[in-house]
């Protein structure tokens, strides 16, 4: 006896639906998703000209806290990304934002495993992105970020 096919209620009008919401990221980061980067009950955010932080939101969907990563590798395991806002402003080495993609810094986003979180390193300097409990953002720390993928 064969069980019923679980998706038989799908039709062309609802076959491409996605569920709105968020989910904590696990494993390797992939490009093309809206992401939030959070630590210490704060989230990386942007004000149009620089990277900053603000209080984490319950649904992880505040527009100024959403980012998209763009893979810059050659081989599948290359961990090289540009980080941009959803308005295509790129994070630079000075943690400012630029419309010029060529000024974007390259970052490595490494899953530390076992739910610890992700380390985010700027590749030229080797310094890790830091989000302090006071909300300040800098390079040169040891913050582990929880990353959430968000569907609006």
What residue ranges belong to the model's regions?
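Lectin-like carbohydrate-binding module/patch detector with strong preference for beta-trefoil
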Residues: 2-152
